[in-house]
Amino acid sequence: PVVIGATQKAGCMGAAYEFLFNIEKWLREQHIRKKVDLYWITPEDYLGHFGIDGMPGGETMLKGFMKIFHIHYRKQVAVEEVMADGVKLNTGEVISSKFVMLMPPFTGVDFIRNSPALEALPNGFLDVEGTYQHKKYKNVWAAGLTVDVPAPFTSKKVPYAVPKTGYPSDETGKIVAENIVRIARGK
């Protein structure tokens, strides 16, 4: 058996879904798919939430893919333990496995955590103003993964986060640059 998924507090479900369907395809190409039980585990309240409160038709589409490709899935679950031969979920279920790939939560980098003056949140991210300026130090700016992004939703059973991928990081970087230029010009 193969277990693919995302752990509690993870925020990059898309990459894990992509890995799931890539490995499913690879197993078919190797002519061994019928011999391998494939499991998807996720803290999401529903398939296709992606940490963005879903997309129109996403849940229906993913349920269809899970059925077509014979993928077992568990939603609203947390990982309690990864063992040599399985994954234990918070429900008490143990899914045996020979291979596991789990997307962990994003956390802040060590230099932020090791800089007490920056007052990082417990997850290692910085709490910033809407301009991406530090709330206390106006000469400190943050963008991308460094920024704490509050979720625009409430997880029902198991916590998970918003995605922090390349595009949002790129966009916050541009906003920071524009705000620095604006302030430097006295606007």
What are these regions (language model features)?
Residues 1-36:
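Rossmann-like NAD(P)H-binding beta-loop-alpha module
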Residues 1, 96-99, 103-171:
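FAD-site-proximal beta/loop scaffold in flavoenzymes
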Residues 25-128:
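A Rossmann-like FAD-binding core segment of flavoenzymes
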